């Protein structure tokens, strides 16, 4: 995978280790779901059990088109090609990859980034392609769907991992995100599912348990005072 603005490429394995411990040992689990799948920084580290269902959703239609098509990018594109793709909304799958891959700080179509060293850029590109190919080999039947998290409101006996836009942060989202509504949804879903949520902090009135935390450097923020945060994984109880 390539990076994703606010994504979990660097710490995905740590989060997946917590989830896998439950996934591997609870025979009542019927499936695994990520309503904010992004570039699958956590998902790619989740264990594959052939007898359960794997779901992934995101509000970005280009991104879902890219994953659903199972297309594999073959070339590094130039700035003019990138700009042309930005204005061509018909090329959804390509936009779903290059928009983030070449976007500055991996924010979709934000500026243009390509490493000035040709060999290092080639290595960066091939590394992303290898991760994409590995994901499709590992999860050949994963089901991708465009929409917000509420499309999964009917799930029962699933593990649901959510990486929403963080409250009071500058993470990109296609529309204003209602954190309070999301928190209520998580509480409701936890009655019949196992729900995990990534965040820096949550409101004091939520009785959620921290099951993992790690100090990280925040590469998405523009305020130097916000560059170091503690990433936390909560179990919704």
Place the predicted regions along the sequence by residue:
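Glycine-rich phosphate-binding "P-loop"
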Residues: 1-4, 168-176
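Short amphipathic alpha-helix with an adjacent loop that forms part of the alpha/beta core around
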Residues: 20-24, 151-157
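Short, polar loop motifs at secondary-structure junctions
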Residues: 37-41, 130-131, 198-203
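Active-site regions of enzymes building and remodeling cell-envelope glycoconjugates
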Residues: 51-55, 72-73, 157-160, 205-219
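Class I S-adenosyl-L-methionine-dependent methyltransferase module
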Residues: 52-146, 150
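Long, positively charged, glycine-interspersed low-complexity recognition regions
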Residues: 174-237
